């Protein structure tokens, strides 16, 4: 069963494009871009996820990342 999202592909792709534009503006290498994106993910989890769910969300995020890079 495919995963459904409450967000449109268009909205997701636009945000991705905007983030890429910022990274390109700063001439970020792949290493720097991954550091920035990782820090953003950490900041979002720390700011918006209840303490009791942080580990679970981080594990789900890391598993999704691993699956998407195969």
Curated annotation (Swiss-Prot):
TM regions (residue ranges): none
Pfam families: DUF1414 (PF07208)
Family affiliation: Belongs to the UPF0352 family.
Official protein name in the record: UPF0352 protein PBPRA2586
Organism: Photobacterium profundum (strain SS9)
